[in-house]
Every structure is written in structure tokens, then in C-alpha cells.
């Protein structure tokens, strides 16, 4: 269970805010097939979001299902593949208890892009780029991720 807390500055009158002023509870199921000796890999992460109401605006974003996925081939020490996500809002946004807009302001998006991972000793370093192919009722853009995983 992932939990996102309302941290960061939030001001109702600002066009953009660092904080969200809501809690989000997100059950997660993640599955991966990975052979450290090399070969094909597949990872899927399923999530479902439950949002609380923003008390400053009386706005509640709808529930949403989303999946992160990656398929790749491990050549040791380099892995290359494709990564992406699909997001679909399943319930309407509501403000003052009423549906927002004719379609409930339901968001949907699909992104795809390349990934490359290099195994540096015991530390995997991954770079991935995701381009949103389409987006509805959400901002549309690109994401670039660079991550390293360390065991403690």
C-alpha cells in the first residue's frame, strides 16, 4: 500500500502548487520476471488510487487505475527495452458534491519509450524516457527517469 501525504506548500489561489492538499491511498501489485544471468525480462505494476477531498477547494479527484510496465532483454551488464504506463480515471471528479464537467473530468493517458540499464557491480543504473502518446483531461508531455538502486 503506497500512501501519498499532503506535504508541500498549497495555496488555493495559486495556479500551480507544489503540494496537493490531499491524501492518496494506493494499493499496489507488482510482478517481475528477471533472470540475473541474462535473457528476457517483464515487469508489471498495477495500482489503484483513492483520493481524499481537498478541504480548501471542496474538490475530490476521482479514483484511478494505472499500470506501469516494461519489457526488456538483459545482455549482461546492459539491458535494453521498452517501458510505459497507462492511466485511466474510473470515477468522476466532484466539487461541492457535484460531478465536474459533462464527462466528470476523467483523465486518461498512455506513454511509451525506451529504457536502458547498466549493471555497475551490485548497483543497477537505469535511464528511461516516456513519451505520452495521448492524454485526455491531463497535461501531456514527456518524462525522463534516471535511477540507481542500492541495497542497505
Go through the PLM ranges and name each one.
Residues 57-152:
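Outer membrane beta-barrel transmembrane domains
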Residues 1-60, 103-107, 119:
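Outer-membrane pore/translocation modules
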Amino acid at each position: 500500500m503506497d500512501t501519498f501525504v499532503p506535504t508541500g506548500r498549497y495555496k488555493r489561489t495559486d495556479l500551480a502548487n507544489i503540494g496537493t492538499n490531499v491524501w492518496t491511498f494506493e494499493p499496489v501489485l507488482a510482478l517481475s520476471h528477471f533472470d540475473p544471468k541474462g535473457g528476457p525480462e517483464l515487469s508489471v505494476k498495477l495500482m489503484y488510487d483513492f483520493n481524499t477531498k481537498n478541504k480548501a477547494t471542496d474538490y475530490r479527484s476521482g479514483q484511478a487505475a494505472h499500470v506501469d510496465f516494461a519489457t526488456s532483454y538483459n545482455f549482461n551488464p546492459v539491458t535494453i527495452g521498452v517501458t510505459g504506463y497507462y492511466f485511466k480515471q474510473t470515477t468522476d471528479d466532484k466539487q461541492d458534491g457535484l460531478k465536474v464537467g459533462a464527462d466528470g473530468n476523467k483523465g486518461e493517458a498512455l506513454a511509451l519509450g525506451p529504457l536502458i540499464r547498466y549493471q555497475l557491480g551490485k548497483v543497477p543504473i537505469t535511464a528511461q524516457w516516456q513519451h505520452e502518446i495521448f492524454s485526455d483531461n491531463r497535461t501531456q508531455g514527456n518524462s525522463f527517469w534516471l535511477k540507481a538502486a542500492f541495497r542497505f
